[in-house]
């Protein structure tokens, strides 16, 4: 183990000087520095740059408070390694793989793997196209998710990205019994805490590993915690041959953390102040999230859109890697439609007749056509009123409004707030319900009966209660 000494500390960035004869640590190696003489308080640093003349520049994974010049730094000779395998299920830990759930720490002999790896080679990849049923109508009908694909949940602050992720974890654990890895990147600690207790109560936690690097942590932890979660998911895929779900909330914070340390590392800022290495960092993470011949990793990533601006470099860079996008729209939350998924802006590579089938494709495209025509007619309605529309257009508007409300539904994870039981709707039921609305079977039922319900049978029951 070669050792050096701290030369300077600038926030989360620490420069370490090694003696001229010593071998310099490699890029991404983990270094350890002890803050106290008892060697109880250690800080892990990760090598980011080699500056020459025995000097390396590192990023701290924990707060650098208490570090002083001259403290000894030890090179571990390898990258940060984290626990993997069945032992991680039901547990919560940080970027370094240390448990933070107040239960027993991992045993010393637990399997560990480095967080930095190469992406699978071209011949290892799987190319099958299979739909992952989520039980959420608007997603399954208009922007279905591919098993082993990458999904982006786009939206500004407070439009429901985290709630949608929680519902997906709930539905997939209950209906498919799959393993999930939840990675909290730079989000609210309170939300992580709520999610942990909800999962514990519902029993879902036994099939989930949780990794957190939250808002209050240094940028080094927020930058690397996504790789920690991904390493655990890769183990289940490659060694145990499992189909894994990887949730990342929020991928924007991964970019933001990189931006925070970029200038301190001596890099020139790029567009909008982001790091010049933005596309490379995103690519290195995203290329590892894929399906191989052994198993699949389906990733669902919440992506915060700063000031609702989709041209911002951070969300725009993430767009390039996705198979499906679920766009959350603030206007829909104002109308009380939840989940607030924009049916026209959301898209999926899987929405093709070869993958979803002819009937599903025909119903989905007709739903989009009706909603698009309704959007075009809204200006006329706002200025001249409904009376100026033809009978055919009035019928279309009525159906479009019913479709818009029927795209909403109650969530299981929101039951404690709404007081209404959540619903899981199979794809076949979803397609049938929308097909019947398009055929005009329910033109006589009130629009309100379609709001926040599950399958079409719920609409009929609700209408009967309303006296229709």
From Swiss-Prot:
Its EC number is 7.1.2.2. This is ATP synthase subunit beta. It is an enzyme of class 7 (translocase). InterPro entries: AAA+_ATPase, ATP-synt_VA_C, ATP_synth_F1_bsu, ATPase_a/bsu_AS, ATPase_alpha/beta_chains, ATPase_F1/V1/A1_a/bsu_N, ATPase_F1/V1/A1_a/bsu_N_sf, ATPase_F1/V1/A1_a/bsu_nucl-bd. It comes from the Bacteria. It comes from Streptococcus pyogenes serotype M3 (strain ATCC BAA-595 / MGAS315). Belongs to the ATPase alpha/beta chains family. It catalyses: ATP + H2O + 4 H(+)(in) = ADP + phosphate + 5 H(+)(out). SUPFAM superfamilies: C-terminal domain of alpha and beta subunits of F1 ATP synthase, N-terminal domain of alpha and beta subunits of F1 ATP synthase, P-loop containing nucleoside triphosphate hydrolases. The keyword Membrane applies. It is a peripheral membrane protein. HAMAP family: ATP_synth_beta_bact. One of its GO terms (molecular function) is ATP binding. Gene3D superfamilies: 2.40.10.170, Bovine Mitochondrial F1-atpase, Atp Synthase Beta Chain, Chain D, domain 3, P-loop containing nucleotide triphosphate hydrolases. SMART domains: AAA (SM00382). It holds the Pfam family ATP-synt_VA_C. Keywords: ATP synthesis, ATP-binding, Cell membrane, CF(1), Hydrogen ion transport, Ion transport, Membrane, Nucleotide-binding, Translocase, Transport. PANTHER family: ATP SYNTHASE, ATP SYNTHASE SUBUNIT BETA, MITOCHONDRIAL. The keyword Membrane applies. F-type ATPases have 2 components, CF(1) - the catalytic core - and CF(0) - the membrane proton channel. CF(1) has five subunits: alpha(3), beta(3), gamma(1), delta(1), epsilon(1). CF(0) has three main subunits: a(1), b(2) and c(9-12). The alpha and beta chains form an alternating ring which encloses part of the gamma chain. CF(1) is attached to CF(0) by a central stalk formed by the gamma and epsilon chains, while a peripheral stalk is formed by the delta and b chains. ATP binds at residues 155-162.
């Amino acid at each position: 183990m070669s050792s050096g000494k701290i030369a300077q500390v600038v926030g989360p960035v620490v420069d370490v000087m090694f003696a001229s004869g010593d071998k310099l640590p490699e890029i991404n190696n983990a270094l350890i520095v002890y803050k106290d003489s008892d060697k109880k308080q250690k800080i892990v640093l990760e090598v980011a740059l080699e500056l020459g003349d025995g000097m390396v520049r590192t990023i701290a994974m924990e707060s650098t408070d208490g570090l002083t010049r001259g403290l000894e730094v030890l090179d571990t000779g390898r990258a940060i390694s984290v626990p993997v395998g069945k032992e991680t299920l039901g547990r919560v830990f940080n970027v370094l793989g240390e448990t933070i759930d107040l239960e027993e720490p991992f045993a010393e002999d637990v399997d560990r793997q480095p967080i930095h790896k190469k992406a699978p080679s071209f011949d290892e990849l799987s190319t099958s196209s299979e739909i992952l049923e989520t039980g959420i109508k608007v997603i399954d009908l208009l922007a279905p998710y591919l098993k082993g694909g990458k999904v982006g949940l786009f939206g500004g602050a407070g439009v429901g990205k985290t709630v949608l992720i929680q519902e997906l974890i709930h539905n997939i654990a209950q209906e498919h019994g799959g393993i999930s890895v939840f990675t909290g990147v730079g989000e609210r600690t309170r939300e992580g805490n709520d999610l942990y207790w909800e999962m514990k109560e519902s029993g879902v936690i036994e099939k989930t590993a949780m990794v957190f690097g939250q808002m209050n942590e240094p940028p080094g932890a927020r930058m690397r915690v996504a790789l920690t979660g991904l390493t655990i998911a890769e183990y289940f895929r490659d060694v145990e041959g499992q189909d894994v779900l990887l949730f990342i909330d929020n991928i924007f914070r991964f970019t933001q953390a990189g931006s925070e340390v970029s200038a301190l590392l001596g890099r020139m800022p790029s567009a909008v102040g982001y790091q010049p290495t933005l596309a490379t960092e995103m690519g290195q993470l995203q290329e590892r999230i894929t399906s191989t011949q052994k198993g699949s990793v389906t990733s669902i990533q919440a992506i915060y859109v700063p000031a609702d601006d989709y041209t911002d470099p951070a969300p725009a860079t993430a767009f390039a890697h996705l198979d499906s996008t679920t766009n959350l729209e603030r206007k829909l939350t104002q109308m009380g439609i939840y989940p607030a998924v924009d049916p026209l802006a959301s898209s999926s590579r899987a929405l093709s007749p070869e993958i979803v089938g002819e009937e599903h494709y025909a119903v989905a495209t007709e739903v989009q056509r009706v909603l698009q025509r309704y959007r075009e007619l809204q200006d006329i309605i706002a200025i001249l009123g409904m009376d100026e529309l033809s009978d055919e257009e009035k019928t279309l508007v009525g159906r479009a409004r019913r479709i818009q409300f029927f795209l909403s539904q109650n969530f299981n994870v929101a039951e404690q707030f709404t007081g209404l039981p959540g619903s899981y709707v199979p794809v076949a039921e979803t397609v049938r319900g929308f097909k019947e609305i398009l055929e005009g079977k329910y033109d006589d039922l009130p629009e309100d009966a379609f709001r926040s319900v599950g399958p079409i049978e719920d609409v009929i029951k609700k209408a009967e209660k309303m006296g229709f």
